[in-house]
């Protein structure tokens, strides 16, 4: 009799333990199901926020919105292919690098690196890394005051198609030499014969010709103080300095910015043609 009671008690305990375990398993399964459903619902929501980082000078918010709309309606965190958007943004000519990634749960993050223009090149721009790129004219109205100021300060380079690197390199060489005497270059121009011409920030034009360019720049720096003295004494302005002579240079003077007068230095006559 005592044995039967112990057996019943044992079976009773086993039954309740099994019931408890079953209940806990059911609750666990229900909880997991609800969590999975919540996660799926959370991730199935559309990407609704866009964060754009990086130093943007040319890229406007309208550009980003247009590209995203062009790529189709934004998907969810799981379904959206960021490579499509990244490829579309990279096609903008002023974009150097772009990174597009998703940030949980509903944000698209875009980081941009644009080419920084060092100068105008013909009707385009040339970057600090020597890459020629263009910018839509309609974007100019969107530029910040900083960018407008930058455009006013960068030089203008002209030259035959395909010679952008050579012109840029010479600009950098000329600029380094003139900077030591507080001159800045507004424009550099060369033609198919590779004759070079500069315009400085004081609007003085330098005609360098096609040979001995560096030597001629140094010569200009040497004689410029004498030209300044004459400008002050006679109230004249320099139109251009012709440095193409084998020795010396000639100066075209302008009185009151109207009448041209020619002046020669170092015994070089006005009509002489002994230059390159």
Swiss-Prot record:
Keywords noted in UniProt: Cell cycle, Cell division, Cell inner membrane, Cell membrane, Membrane, Transmembrane, Transmembrane helix
One Pfam family of this chain: POTRA_1
Gene3D superfamilies tied to this protein: Cell division protein FtsQ/DivIB, membrane protein fhac
GO annotation, biological process: cell septum assembly; FtsZ-dependent cytokinesis
UniProt-listed InterPro entries: Cell_div_FtsQ/DivIB_C, FtsQ, FtsQ_C_sf, POTRA, POTRA_FtsQ_type
Protein purpose: Essential cell division protein. May link together the upstream cell division proteins, which are predominantly cytoplasmic, with the downstream cell division proteins, which are predominantly periplasmic. May control correct divisome assembly.
The protein, known as: Cell division protein FtsQ
Organism: Blochmanniella floridana
Gene: ftsQ
